[in-house]
Structures are given as structure tokens and as C-alpha cells.
């Protein structure tokens, strides 16, 4: 399971010209599911995302996590993160989770984070989405479990 996380001042996702999810300070999470992913990997990644210390403390050091700064999550499904780009000029998605598996683990990730008291907004699974953000830093990390 892969999460590309970006520290943002604000982010939103639109579908068909309508904003369906938006946050201010927090993390934009682009979430990719791979074939071998399961509930245990999802929980490990969700915990890591929420606990990752990438927000600045009073000394300007990345020392605080999402909860400590009162931030929110905007979680967007992104199957292309599971692409194999090692050969040729066209990505292979053979390692990506099935749509059914990905949808289930995506929703489980969202529910798990919300159950931990983190405000969560989402995109729409498998929709054509337009994602806008103001990256803070920029600070971007690729987390994988």
C-alpha cells in the first residue's frame, strides 16, 4: 500500500465541476492499493500517515504530527501509484489491486483515520477528479508498507 502525502495549506477535489472534498491545513493523501495489500497493511499505513512528524514546531523543525497541529486529511484514490515503470515507455498496472480490493481498502483507510479523531474528506473512488492544492513547503513524502 502506498501513500503519497503532501503537507498542504489547503486542498480540494472536484468531480464534474463540483467540490466534493476540501480541507485547510493538513495532508493531501494520494492512496494506491497493491495486490498483496490487506487490512493489516492498511492500518499500519494509516497510523504512519497520521503519526508522521512533518509539521513544524516552534523552532521550525519537522517535529509535529497531523493530530498535534489540528490538521485534516483529504484522501484521494490513486491507482497509478502502484504502476511498474521499470521497463519501456508505458506503465504496467499488473501489481495494482483489483478495483474491488482497492475500493474496500480505500474506504477502510478513510474510516480508520476518522475513527482516530482526524477530520477526513475524500475524493470519489474511480471518478475523474481534479485535485487542487497549495503545497506547504513544499513537503511531500512517499510512504509504503
UniProtKB/Swiss-Prot annotation:
Subcellular location: Cytoplasm
Gene Ontology molecular function terms on file: D-tyrosyl-tRNA(Tyr) deacylase activity; Gly-tRNA(Ala) deacylase activity; Ser(Gly)-tRNA(Ala) hydrolase activity; tRNA binding
Catalytic activity: glycyl-tRNA(Ala) + H2O = tRNA(Ala) + glycine + H(+); a D-aminoacyl-tRNA + H2O = a tRNA + a D-alpha-amino acid + H(+)
The UniProt record lists the keyword Oxidoreductase: no
Matching SUPFAM superfamilies: DTD-like (SSF69500)
EC number(s) recorded for this UniProt protein: 3.1.1.96
Motif Gly-cisPro motif, important for rejection of L-amino acids location, chain numbering: 137-138
Gene Ontology biological process terms, A to Z: D-amino acid catabolic process
Keywords tagged on the record: Cytoplasm, Hydrolase, RNA-binding, tRNA-binding
Main location: cytoplasm
Transmembrane segments: none
Superkingdom, taxonomy of origin: Bacteria
HAMAP family in the record: Deacylase_Dtd
Family, as annotated: Belongs to the DTD family.
Complexes and interactors: Homodimer.
Function: An aminoacyl-tRNA editing enzyme that deacylates mischarged D-aminoacyl-tRNAs. Also deacylates mischarged glycyl-tRNA(Ala), protecting cells against glycine mischarging by AlaRS. Acts via tRNA-based rather than protein-based catalysis; rejects L-amino acids rather than detecting D-amino acids in the active site. By recycling D-aminoacyl-tRNA to D-amino acids and free tRNA molecules, this enzyme counteracts the toxicity associated with the formation of D-aminoacyl-tRNA entities in vivo and helps enforce protein L-homochirality.
Name this polypeptide is given: D-aminoacyl-tRNA deacylase
The organism of origin for this protein: Shewanella loihica (strain ATCC BAA-1088 / PV-4)
Lineage: Bacteria, Pseudomonadati, Pseudomonadota, Gammaproteobacteria, Alteromonadales
Gene responsible for this protein: dtd
Amino acid at each position: 500500500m502506498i501513500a503519497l502525502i503532501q503537507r498542504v495549506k489547503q486542498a480540494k477535489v472536484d468531480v464534474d465541476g463540483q467540490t466534493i472534498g476540501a480541507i485547510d491545513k493538513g495532508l493531501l493523501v494520494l492512496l494506491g492499493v497493491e495486490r498483496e495489500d490487506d487490512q493489516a497493511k492498511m492500518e499500519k499505513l494509516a497510523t504512519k500517515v497520521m503519526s508522521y512528524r512533518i509539521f513544524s514546531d516552534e523552532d521550525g523543525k519537522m517535529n509535529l504530527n497531523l493530530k498535534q497541529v489540528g490538521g485534516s486529511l483529504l484522501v484521494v484514490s490513486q491507482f497509478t501509484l502502484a504502476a511498474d515503470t521499470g521497463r519501456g515507455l508505458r506503465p504496467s498496472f499488473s501489481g495494482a489491486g483489483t478495483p474491488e480490493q482497492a475500493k474496500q481498502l480505500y474506504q477502510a483507510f478513510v474510516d480508520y483515520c476518522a475513527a482516530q479523531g482526524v477530520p477526513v474528506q475524500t475524493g470519489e473512488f474511480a471518478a475523474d477528479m481534479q485535485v487542487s492544492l497549495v503545497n506547504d513547503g513544499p513537503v511531500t513524502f512517499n510512504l509504503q508498507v
